[in-house]
Amino acid sequence: MNKIKVNMLLLCGLLGCSSLAYADVAVVVNLNNSTTLSDSDISRVFLGKLKKFSNGEKATPVNLKFGSATRNEFEEKALKKSSSQIKAYWSKRVFSGKGKPPKELGTAKDIMALVASDVNAVGYVDASTVNDSVRVIKTF
């Protein structure tokens, strides 16, 4: 009986520590994009509900590839949805003709290169990978 309790405590401790392993996610825009976005605005941009920045310019969201740890973290923290909920959301939007999901890129380096070259792009990367080619507007 004591062995079961010890194993359960160890399991709970490991599960609790696993959430600490996630890194911060930085939402990034082009250096020449002076926009600010609220948490709600960020969510709406990545869900295809907000198509323009406050300055009237088109907002072009860019995702990391499906299943990446940073993308999962972003979806949970910024969009308040699991990856399966996001997948179902976009399947429904595409099927009904109401939108298409953001473009997907493979790496943080790819995201930052695109954002650095496109004033309308908004993406997210692991905060530890941010360089001076982009501007961080929010960290989750």
Question: For each predicted feature, which ranges?
Answer:
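Repetitive helical segments and hydrophobic/amphipathic motifs
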Residues: L11-G16
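Sec/Tat signal peptide C-region and signal peptidase I cleavage site
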Residues: C17-A23
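Bacterial N-terminal signal peptides that target proteins for export
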Residues: M1-L9
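Exported/periplasmic ABC-transporter solute-binding proteins
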Residues: D24-F140
